[in-house]
Amino acid sequence: MFLVIRVRGTTGVIKNIADTLDMLRLNRISHAVLVEDTPSYNGMLQKAKDYITWGEIDADLLAEIIAKRGKFTGNNKVTDEYVAENSDYKNIDELAKAVIAGEVKLMDLDIKPVFRLHPPRKGYEDIRLSVKEGGSLGYRGENIKDLAERML
């Protein structure tokens, strides 16, 4: 499971890349979504790599993101009580583990698929360079945790 974050804006985006970003539901800067590690999603990530960054997410970070930035229908915050009432899981931590394992999707519980994060504290490295070149774009692997924690 990947966490995908949009880094760059909409100005000058080629139409097919803009369509890919729309399919990923990344409409604004600092929005984040979860995607599965499938060949079709990998192709979409490679196509939009000059506007996004992504990496593997673990259950602890996902639980923190859901608790702080998760919203359900009506723009209400996701709480342990909401998860216990509307699912088979007792709290957000158990839900996060189930989402990572692929047992359940956030949409099944009416949790919005897009997380609206803050811009990162201390800023991005460089929004025009890849991670390998010292920038912020492209595949990060496990280092997505550092960026996501700065954005919560």
Swiss-Prot record:
Keywords: Ribonucleoprotein, Ribosomal protein. The keyword Ribosomal protein applies. InterPro entries: Ribo_uL30_ferredoxin-like_sf, Ribosomal_uL30, Ribosomal_uL30_arc, Ribosomal_uL30_CS, Ribosomal_uL30_euk_arc, Ribosomal_uL30_ferredoxin-like. GO terms for molecular function: RNA binding; structural constituent of ribosome. SUPFAM superfamilies: Ribosomal protein L30p/L7e. One of its GO terms (cellular component) is cytosolic large ribosomal subunit. One of its GO terms (biological process) is translation. Part of the 50S ribosomal subunit. Belongs to the universal ribosomal protein uL30 family. PANTHER family: 60S RIBOSOMAL PROTEIN L7, LARGE RIBOSOMAL SUBUNIT PROTEIN UL30. This is Large ribosomal subunit protein uL30. It comes from Methanobrevibacter smithii (strain ATCC 35061 / DSM 861 / OCM 144 / PS).
